Amino acid sequence: IQSTSMDQGBLSEDSMNSFIRTLIQAGIWKNKVPKQTARTKDGTQTAVKKTKAEPDVVANKDRLGFQPIVSVDAELLRQQRRFSSPRVLLSENTPLEPPPLYLTEEPMGLNRTSRRKRFAEGKSHRGEYSVCDSESRWVTDKSSAVDIRGHQVTVLGEIRMGPS
């Protein structure tokens, strides 16, 4: 992917809009691949020229739900590293599987309403919160629990209100 003068706009633009514009210019957005490649038996890639009948075949495949797999060049990710977003993290590294939250065998892991920061590699110190399921159900036979800070607390059987 080569950058054009349009990519080098002023730095006050939204970083994700700039990234999406770069993808659109490269033909990656909406599954448009600028150049088709084919693999030979020895694993090397060669460029394939389109024939006149090929656009009809591609259009029919798109109507049937076929979507080609598009790989994004690692150089594009390196160029976009300066952009930061609270929701999207562009990284060349694959995420940990499973996330560190599920590896801990603590009472905190059993509390499905708590949120814990995951460990983030590098210098960004970005806090990633795991998304937990919510469960609306009364529990009547519980005498102790773990609060959102991880402290053991006693569950009151009854609450007295008003003058005593």
Swiss-Prot record:
Predominant cellular place of this UniProt entry's protein: secreted
Listed Pfam families: NGF, NTF3_N
Listed PROSITE patterns: NGF_2
Propeptide: 4-118
Molecular-function GO term, any one: growth factor activity
Leader sequence residues: 1-3
Alphabetized UniProt keyword annotations: Cleavage on pair of basic residues, Glycoprotein, Growth factor, Secreted, Signal
GO terms (BP aspect): cell surface receptor protein tyrosine kinase signaling pathway; modulation of chemical synaptic transmission; negative regulation of neuron apoptotic process; nerve development; nerve growth factor signaling pathway; neuron projection morphogenesis
Subcellular location: Secreted
Superkingdom of this protein's organism: Eukaryota
Residue ranges of the region described as Disordered: 89-126
Entry's Gene Ontology cellular component terms: axon; dendrite; extracellular space; synaptic vesicle
Entry-listed glycosylation sites: N111
Role description: Seems to promote the survival of visceral and proprioceptive sensory neurons.
Family: Belongs to the NGF-beta family.
Name of the protein this chain belongs to: Neurotrophin-3
Organism from which the protein derives: Cylindrophis ruffus
